[in-house]
Amino acid sequence: MYTRYSYNPSLGRTYVYDNKFYKNLGSVIKNAKRKEHLALHEIEERTLDPLERYVVAEDPFLGPGKNQKLTLFKEIRIVKPDTMKLVVNWSGKEFLRETWTRFMEDSFPIVNDQEIMDVFLVINMRPTRPNRCFRFLAQHALRCDPDYVPHEVIRIVEPVYVGNNNEYRISLAKKGGGCPVMNLHSEYTHSFEEFINRVIWENFYKPIVYVGTDSGEEEEILLELSLVFKIKEFAPDAPLYNGPAY
């Protein structure tokens, strides 16, 4: 017989469920997706492992090879607000004008038995008036029909702001790249016009370039245009083969 002070197991009985067999459905799904993502990531990493043997430059201008600069001309262009002016038109005969040869370097800075890997068109822009506060804009196209006649002045539509040192740089290399032409010095000294047509434009794009400013006033811009040749160096930093001759 139970008294009021006796322990009766049927009175006030509580049930406690062990929670280790019950999991939140959201955490189960998230954990499964996380495991699947890790498995796919490991597979992708394994496929990319062979590429770790190669080195890629973030900027092709700073990649392997030697940069040789050929200054073509310097001149002043007046640009009106909200417009861009044509400064380079390789589709015509603009490279034959006198101002190009006036600032041409006396000797071509490329010696024999070297290969052109890439050609960069470099346009350096500087304001001629002091205490001016504006940014330079530029647009370019790499290909056009030989008979295409571009407009001298266009309206500003989706331009690119010119970056460091007010220098606009365009890679003219075609897909596949390279210009396997030797004896470049003799080609250039024989005839500059033939060198441009036969060597450069046979292997690289002809650009059309417009420049402008975001200023609300008419501005004078001093332009310096040059071609920078990325030259393949035939003396690698590390030997390709190991042996007694190296």
Swiss-Prot record:
Any Pfam family matching the protein: Polyhedrin
GO CC terms, sorted: viral occlusion body
Keyword annotations: Viral occlusion body
InterPro entries: Polyhedrin
Single Gene Ontology MF annotation: structural molecule activity
Family statement drawn from the similarity comment of this UniProt entry: Belongs to the polyhedrin family.
Function: Major component of the virus occlusion bodies, which are large proteinaceous structures (polyhedra), that protect the virus from the outside environment for extended periods until they are ingested by insect larvae.
Protein name, as recorded: Polyhedrin
Gene assigned in the entry: PH
